[in-house]
From Swiss-Prot:
Pathway: Amino-acid biosynthesis; L-arginine biosynthesis; L-arginine from L-ornithine and carbamoyl phosphate: step 3/3. Gene3D superfamilies: Fumarase/aspartase (C-terminal domain), Fumarase/aspartase (Central domain), Fumarase/aspartase (N-terminal domain). The gene is argH. One of its GO terms (molecular function) is argininosuccinate lyase activity. This is Argininosuccinate lyase. Keywords: Amino-acid biosynthesis, Arginine biosynthesis, Cytoplasm, Lyase. It comes from Shewanella sp. (strain MR-7). Signal peptide: none annotated. GO terms for biological process: arginine biosynthetic process via ornithine; L-arginine biosynthetic process. It is an enzyme of class 4 (lyase).
């Protein structure tokens, strides 16, 4: 039976029930709904709506229901209830009779679902924080393993300057740390309890909402009932934090897909995160990384979906807000498995050092060093930039690297070039000169890894 049937004389259509019911989605809030109901039983007992004995009986029945459903989750969907709140209330009434009908006194499904959803976000958010920390640890471990593996750094997907693989790993550590900061910050703002806000104007019973918030492990109660039941910022922020983090995961996946390609060959991926072709027996495809990249779009879509749903809703609650959960659940599921998969990919990744080094030695990645050398001899940088550009054109025409020019040939570009130019053009010199905070010099990479390990 619907919780709102008294107002209606006619039956709802089967199509409307199918359209209106949210149980196939919000069943995932079952545990939170029971926990919130237990706290609410204590709250209404505190203001004399039910006796201490009745409160104890309600809480016992709710805890029994929690155990039963954990043992057989299928009973929720088999119930045919309108939503998770209806399921819990009906199951409670089946256990304790008319006493179960007292539990909803002073409470609306509006503040109930707002509370359930915040509890769910807090629980899932804590698990996501742990996953981000695991991925961060894997990146740091990989950076330490491969801190001195040389590879080309890219701009515009063209070889630019040599860097180390450790430096590349640490770049993504920075991104993951920002993801952690964003998520924990969002969870702080979501750490307020809407329960007791009623449908929109506040409950009519003079209960202590601070105690209610503490009972549910919230930092504090919400302060405005209209906002409390209509606020979905926590959903938007969690989807937003996920979207930015997925962008980072997608960028990392794209880098690794390229590094793993036959055209680059800088890394090898473990068999456990790759798959083959049904036709081409030689293929070893980076499917885990491609799926991370692909799932990013659906996370973005859910963020846009909740923003669009909320953008024109008047205060307070509207049925549109029932659409907040499906996208949120998909976002959290997608983000969680992508974080787990990214960590697994990194744990089995091996750098093919000879290939990566050879690529770093090609493409005139030491051209900037030649320009800096000319600057050290007194030439203005803009002029040095032009001179080296001319030298690169000549080297390309001769199909040789810059360091293959003879001293006489070098002096046709600038007569200030001496024999000491050659040590400046080695890969080792290119790296060593970037010995500045945040640079790719081995000393800096080692220091950065050490600093990250103590955080």
């Amino acid at each position: 039976m619907a919780l709102w049937g008294g107002r209606f004389q006619g039956e709802t259509s089967a199509l409307f029930k199918l359209f209106n019911d949210s149980l196939p989605v919000d069943y995932r809030l079952f545990e939170q709904d029971v926990v919130g109901s237990i706290a609410w039983a204590d709250a209404i007992a505190s203001v004399g709506i039910i006796t201490a004995t009745e409160c104890s009986d309600l809480k016992k029945a709710l805890n029994e229901l929690l155990v039963e459903v954990k043992g057989d989750p299928a009973i929720i969907l088999a119930s045919g209830a309108e939503d998770i709140h209806s399921f819990v209330e009906s199951a409670l009434i089946a256990k304790v009779g008319d006493l179960g009908k007292k539990l909803h006194t002073g409470r609306s499904r509006n503040d109930q679902v707002a509370t359930d959803l915040k509890l769910w976000c807090q629980s899932e958010g804590a698990a996501l924080v742990a996953r981000l920390q695991t991925l961060r640890s894997e990146l740091i471990a990989l950076a330490e393993r491969e801190f001195d593996a040389v590879m080309p750094g890219y701009t515009h997907l063209q070889r630019a300057q040599p860097v180390t693989f450790g430096h590349w790993c640490l770049a993504y550590v920075e991104m993951i740390e920002r993801d952690l900061s964003r998520l924990t910050d969002a969870l702080k703002r979501a750490n307020t309890c809407p329960l007791g806000s009623g449908a929109l104007a506040g409950t009519a019973y003079q209960m202590d909402r601070h105690s209610l918030a503490v009972a549910l492990n919230f930092a504090s109660p919400t302060l405005n009932s209209l906002d409390s039941v209509s606020d979905r910022d926590h959903v938007v922020e969690l989807c937003g934090a996920a979207s930015i983090s997925m962008m980072h995961l997608s960028r990392m996946a794209e880098d690794l897909i390229f590094f793993n390609s036959g055209e680059a060959g800088f890394i090898s991926l473990s068999d456990e995160v790759t798959s083959g072709s049904s036709l081409m027996p030689q293929k070893k495809n980076p499917d885990a990384l491609e799926l991370i990249r692909g799932k990013t779009g659906r996370v973005y879509g859910s963020l846009v979906g909740i923003l669009t749903t909320m953008k024109a809703l008047p205060l307070a609650y509207n049925k549109d807000m029932q659409e907040d959960k499906e996208g949120l659940f998909d976002v959290v599921d997608s983000w969680a498995i992508c974080l787990d998969m990214a960590a697994l990919v990194l744990s089995g990744l091996v750098v093919n050092r000879p290939n990566a080094l050879l690529a770093a030695q090609q493409g005139y990645a030491n051209a900037t060093e030649l320009a800096d050398y000319l600057v050290s001899k007194g030439m203005p940088f803009r002029e040095a930039h032009h001179v080296v550009g001319v030298a690169v054109v000549a080297a390309i025409a001769k199909k040789i690297p810059l360091e293959a020019f003879s001293l006489a040939e070098f002096r046709t570009f600038a007569d200030i070039i001496e024999a000491d130019v050659y040590p400046n053009l080695t890969i080792e010199a290119c790296l060593a000169k970037r010995d500045v905070l945040g640079g790719t010099a081995l000393t800096q990479v080692k220091q950065a890894i050490a600093a990250k390990k103590v955080i």
